[in-house]
Amino acid sequence: MNNVRPKLSMLTEEQIQEIHDHTMNVLETVGVRVDSPSALEMLKKKVGASMVNDRLVKIPRELVEWAIKSAPKQVQVYDRRGKPQFTVGGPEDRIRFGIGVTALYYQEPDTDTPVLFERKHMRDMVRVGNKLPHYDMVSTVGIVRDVPEHLTDMYGSLEHFVNGVKPLVLLVSDEHKFNDVMEMFETLHGDLGEKPFIIPYFNPVSPLVMNEGTVDKMKIAIERGLPVIVSNYSMSGA
């Protein structure tokens, strides 16, 4: 019984293909607003100037299909010490769980009193997450608020990095600090892409907007060979 793994299937292959076809139609006929100048220039070269109107880019189906086929089918994720942890994609892939994410307050376990989230809370929560055997990763647990505001992401990410070895799902609140955080990790660890254990987490703006901060952070992560999570969550009425 310990080997029983439930499987939840929400859509048939035909329904998935239908959704994909409608998505391709929206991208080709409506397009996406791209706020990043560097990404906009790259897309102009790919789709042609006739498919770009100011910041609105219409993306042809064949380009999307090419991108899907070119993407790696599997990504091996490691821990900070270089030990393989799990593979994303492939026939044996399954749902993964991690602790998180980005609390502004910490509820004191002895008194239930909410207090501002501090470095010590990040340190303790990351250590707890690393001891939980059924959790595969540790996300950015909170936003530390006992340091200068412009250094929040630096201190929080440092505590996240040094207090655990599990794969790290990273959320950096200040888009201008993301590259600084990556450079800090490289100083501490070296090449981040050789055996990736950091998975940056991004939220573009719904619907059909690729905002500058998100796109530029994605570019920084991808150029380092890191897998990313793009959580383009749905919005009522969008």
Regions from the PLM with identified roles:
Residues 114-238:
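Helix-rich catalytic cores of soluble enzyme domains
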Residues 1-120:
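Acidic/polar, glycine-rich intrinsically disordered N-terminal extensions of enzymes
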